[in-house]
Curated annotation (Swiss-Prot):
Keyword tags: Gas vesicle
Stated name of the protein: Gas vesicle protein C
Task of the protein: Confers stability, involved in shaping gas vesicles, hollow, gas filled proteinaceous nanostructures. During planktonic growth they allow positioning of the organism at a favorable depth for light or nutrient acquisition.
Organism of origin: Spirulina sp. (strain CCAP 1475/10)
GO CC aspect terms: gas vesicle
Length: 39
């Protein structure tokens, strides 16, 4: 049971990490696009 709990929280953490990573990529993409438009 303990192992299952650990795996579950581990998976959730990885999902949260992936989400924030996508969030960062989107932000960087938006900034880069704005910079190109302004240039």
């Amino acid at each position: 049971a303990l192992q299952d709990d650990w795996q579950q929280s581990h998976l959730e953490r990885r999902q949260v990490l992936a989400e924030s990573q996508k969030q960062i990529q989107a932000t960087i993409g938006a900034l880069x696009x704005e910079r190109q438009x302004x240039a």
